[in-house]
From Swiss-Prot:
Role description: Thiamine-binding protein that interacts with the energy-coupling factor (ECF) ABC-transporter complex. Unlike classic ABC transporters this ECF transporter provides the energy necessary to transport a number of different substrates. The substrates themselves are bound by transmembrane, not extracytoplasmic soluble proteins and transport it into cells. Binds thiamine with a dissociation constant of 0.5 nM. Upon coexpression with its energy-coupling factor (ECF) ABC-transporter complex EcfA1A2T in Lactococcus lactis subsp.
Transmembrane domains' residue ranges: 7-27, 29-49, 53-73, 85-105, 124-144, 170-190
Signal peptide: none
Name of this protein: Thiamine transporter ThiT
InterPro entries: Thia_Transptr_ThiT
One annotated Gene Ontology cellular component of this protein: plasma membrane
NCBIfam families: ECF_ThiT_YuaJ
Species in which this protein is naturally found: Lacticaseibacillus paracasei (strain ATCC 334 / BCRC 17002 / CCUG 31169 / CIP 107868 / KCTC 3260 / NRRL B-441)
Record note on quaternary structure: In Lactococcus lactis subsp. cremoris (strain NZ9000) forms a stable energy-coupling factor (ECF) transporter complex probably composed of a membrane-embedded substrate-binding protein (S component), two ATP-binding proteins (A components) and a transmembrane protein (T component).
Similarity section: Belongs to the vitamin uptake transporter (VUT/ECF) (TC 2.A.88) family. Thiamine transporter subfamily.
Main location: membrane
UniProt subcellular location: Cell membrane
Membrane topology recorded in Swiss-Prot or TrEMBL: Multi-pass membrane protein
Amino acid sequence: MQQHKQLVVILETAIIAAFAMALTYIPHTTGVSAIELNYGLIPIAVLAMRRGLVPAAWAGFVWGILDLILRGIGGGSVLNPLQGILEYPIAFTLVGLMGLTFASFQKAVRGSEKVKASGYAFAGIIIGTFAKYFIHFIAGVVFWGAYAPKGTNVWVYSLIVNGGSALFSTVLTIVVVGVLLTVAPQLFVAKDGKSFSTKAA
């Protein structure tokens, strides 16, 4: 039975990673050039609140590897091995930090405290998203500085691009997760109660 539950978590993690990758192909560039909406963060957020930090981190890692192979290398977004590792497996894995609020979220959602549950979910989303884009911000300064518009400070340019992407993606994810919490709260509660993170009280 225990092995079956673990298999279910692994399958959910793999499905979420694949779904996040699929969402990446939806056009997602907004007004200012290079600022993007990251739809893939939405399923990772759901998994983080449903299963915890470790499954979410693994889903992020797999998503990062897929994005590296399917888009990064072929799309010219990998300048060298160090930058590729930093901006794909590492940055995407950090999205799993959304699961830091898993235990508190589960306690709230199981107690039908929707306002508290929303607050914990939103806090986790902010942590995970900004952790990811902090890595992109550093990489933007170190590796992408030469591509900044002439006369533009590389720190400022990277902050605008990556900070803007983080902000837009965070707002999008919070809105969608908020709607899902209202219309389908059961989506965030695993029937088997299994996680590889801190257990809800």
